Amino acid sequence: MKVWMAILISILCWQSSVWAVCPAWSPARAQEEISRLQQQIKQWDDDYWKEGKSEVEDGVYDQLSARLTQWQRCFGSEPRDVMMPPLNGAVMHPVAHTGVRKMVDKNALSLWMRERSDLWVQPKVDGVAVTLVYRDGKLNKAISRGNGLKGEDWTQKVSLISAVPQTVSGPLANSTLQGEIFLQREGHIQQQMGGINARAKVAGLMMRQDDSDTLNSLGVFVWAWPDGPQLMTDRLKELATAGFTLTQRYTRAVKNADEVARVRNEWWKAKLPFVTDGVVVRGAKEPESRHWLPGQAEWLVAWKYQPVAQVAEVKAIQFAVGKSGKISVVASLAPVMLDDKKVQRVNIGSVRRWQEWDIAPGDQILVSLAGQGIPRIDDVVWRGAERTKPTPPENRFNSLTCYFASDVCQEQFISRLVWLGSKQVLGLDGIGEAGWRALHQTHRFEHIFSWLLLTPEQLQNTPGIAKSKSAQLWHRFNLARKQPFTRWVMAMGIPLTRAALNASDERSWSQLLFSTEQFWQQLPGTGSGRARQVIEWKENAQIKKLGSWLAAQQITGFEP
């Protein structure tokens, strides 16, 4: 009963997630968007199957195909078969290719494994599927997967692949094997290198008309021996003896999902001789081959890796003004998972960069993680039929604007508050951008230091600030008064590095105001241009007004 309840909950959660991401389109808009993406994928299919080339990365193709299926389900269309092979394959498979059902996560895999035994895990090698038919000890036929029942005659091509044994003996002398033709790699680390479009490269080599030495760059991983020995260990031993050594090397017995997860993670990070996109868990006990049909395999499932890069829908384009006045563009995304990290926003860069990318809400972009786990845009993989871009704010801001609050200064003003509260400046732990916005919205700050006047009662009654944290926040605000003079000057945005400011030995506001351009220019890392910026900064009316206000608050170094 518990198992069925868990399955029911999983189904309901899955359905809820699908319903939640259905686009808010009119029927006409939905028809147009679905039709455009369908045509593009059909073109990619034709290129892949008929010409053996691919204009799109395998991962992008897979994810956009899934996106198309999602849209079709949302709007009542008939979902397409992913990667539909050509219909002219005429060679019957002795045993049908079943395909493999995908598990959405570890919990789903655990449910599937719970009622099964004698289970084994193998890498899900990323290439193209093939049937190898041996008769009287010789390779008699090689057939592409096709539609699972019929495929193309690949015998001539496969006979040129040195990694495929042309003769076998013993139980394999009259056998049918199913496996994956893959691109041989030396020390391929999936976590670091990704899929490298391996599937398309293999398909390209197999589709070309000319026989090339490049076929020797291919290998084969046998993952099924229909009607073979009952014991998996016997199967693996016979395959290894015949020359299919990789199958034995990369097939391990597993008892539960935790063990599968450990192997999956190991292979994700290990040096392997092929590209993978997950693992396959299979039972050693299989039905007789005459019962095998496409889409009917209940004895094996796949648990794929999260793609290194994910296709994400752009929900909105937002503009942010930094403390220096520079306008940056941020894309809000429909949430995607990257390496266990939920990504909902990605920085595009400057307005000019955004215009070069040509990104609008509704577009599909490829997102990955750069150094230190920071999301980045790799490509725009699909643009919507209807595209409306927001207008960026006027470029009226600079490093000397928005110390005082106003309607037009909202974003730069908040950026200044976030900066001064950071660890390297005044160290106001416990408050970030959301907290500053809540304080400013409630108490309408006059300038960037107005928070010094807030009382414990005001903080406690601020919407968005937890009452349990308001006392701590007031305490930190009070402690900030004792920060060194140089920290307060940094909070005011002086255009100097901390090292240069410390080297100046400035200890009071009056001393700083009387320092000359020549004085600043002598500091380490400070040239004539930076020295002029310091002069402009200290002579700015807003800066002078802030200095006077801090003096009235008896902040160290600002007292008359």
From Swiss-Prot:
GO terms for molecular function: DNA ligase (NAD+) activity. Gene3D superfamilies: DNA ligase/mRNA capping enzyme, Helix hairpin bin, Nucleic acid-binding proteins. Its EC number is 6.5.1.2. Keywords: DNA damage, DNA repair, DNA replication, Ligase, NAD. It catalyses: NAD(+) + (deoxyribonucleotide)n-3'-hydroxyl + 5'-phospho-(deoxyribonucleotide)m = (deoxyribonucleotide)n+m + AMP + beta-nicotinamide D-nucleotide. The active site is at K124. The keyword DNA repair applies. Belongs to the NAD-dependent DNA ligase family. LigB subfamily. This is DNA ligase B. It comes from Escherichia coli O139:H28 (strain E24377A / ETEC). The gene is ligB.
